[in-house]
UniProtKB/Swiss-Prot annotation:
Superkingdom of the source species: Bacteria
Tagged with keyword RNA-binding: yes
Biological process annotations from GO: regulation of translation; translation
GO CC entries: large ribosomal subunit
Coiled coil: none
Keyword entries, A-Z: Repressor, Ribonucleoprotein, Ribosomal protein, RNA-binding, rRNA-binding, Translation regulation, tRNA-binding
InterPro entries reported for this sequence: Ribosom_uL1_bac-type (IPR005878), Ribosomal_uL1 (IPR002143), Ribosomal_uL1-like (IPR023674), Ribosomal_uL1/biogenesis (IPR028364), Ribosomal_uL1_3-a/b-sand (IPR016095), Ribosomal_uL1_CS (IPR023673)
Function, in words: Binds directly to 23S rRNA. The L1 stalk is quite mobile in the ribosome, and is involved in E site tRNA release. Protein L1 is also a translational repressor protein, it controls the translation of the L11 operon by binding to its mRNA.
Name of the gene: rplA
Protein name (record): Large ribosomal subunit protein uL1
CDD domains cross-referenced by the UniProt entry: Ribosomal_L1 (cd00403)
Subunit structure: Part of the 50S ribosomal subunit.
A Pfam family assignment: Ribosomal_L1
């Protein structure tokens, strides 16, 4: 077992072995995020699904109300006049077969790849490169579309794609330590609603197993999922 650093061990002693109310958990995470940079706040959620079955896979997008606090690099593979549209909309990389070839040679200087449907036969050839990194465009994720400009705008504004990994765990970065706990909760609530809304048809038994939040350099805190689901804004 990996030995905890003195810093991590000290922070961990402040956390009780119990399930916390959402805002209390987020307060603790913010308090412990004391590195010399603005730490990213993450959610790690274990779901009662087995993604090896197609009807138990989860892959979708969510538009967080307060964004993620991170800037992302977007690449767009398209054709014709859409190339100039992608450039005008703020894409960091854009092109046709030239970009396909560049990516195939190892150019992975982007966080998200968007493609128009007409280019997908060529993009499909990049499966070996894109697949392991989770970067293959997908209609369900909103990354295969003819509305290039709007897709770029939404993802730059904080829309993000997430999926359950092979173990049925969802890993999502949903803010920064500099966010207020209320803003972090708004994002977390929106994420929870998206996961419930997109529950796989083949999911059986208990859907939500465990729900943890953490920061880049801090320990994790378990959150009461029922309290998140049952929250109703005042007024």
């Amino acid at each position: 077992m990996k030995k905890l650093s003195k810093r991590m061990a000290a922070l961990s002693t402040k956390i009780e072995d119990r399930i916390y109310a959402p805002l209390e958990a987020l307060s603790i995470i913010k308090e412990n995020a004391n590195a010399k940079f603005d730490e990213t706040i993450e959610a790690h959620i274990r779901l009662g699904i087995d993604p090896k079955y197609t009807d138990q896979q989860l892959r979708t997008t969510v538009a967080l109300p307060h964004g993620t606090g991170q800037s992302i690099k977007i690449a767009v593979i398209t054709s014709g006049e859409n190339v100039s549209k992608a450039k005008a909309a703020g894409a960091d990389l854009f092109g046709e077969e030239d970009l396909v070839e560049s990516i195939n040679k190892g150019n992975m200087e982007f966080d998200l790849l968007i493609a128009t449907p007409d280019m997908m036969p060529k993009v499909a050839k990049l499966g070996r490169v894109l697949g392991p990194r989770g970067l293959m465009p997908n209609p369900k994720a909103g990354t295969v579309t003819n509305d290039i400009a709007n897709a770029i705008k939404e993802f730059k504004a904080g829309k993000l794609e997430f999926r359950a990994d092979k173990a049925g765990i969802v890993h999502v970065r949903f803010g920064k330590a500099s966010f207020t706990k209320e803003a972090l909760f708004d994002n977390l609530k929106t994420l929870q609603e998206s996961i419930d809304k997109n529950k796989p048809s083949g999911a059986k038994g208990k859907y939500w197993k465990t729900f943890y939040v953490t920061s880049t350099m801090g320990p994790s805190v378990q959150v009461d999922i029922n309290a998140v689901q049952d929250y109703q804004p005042e007024g």
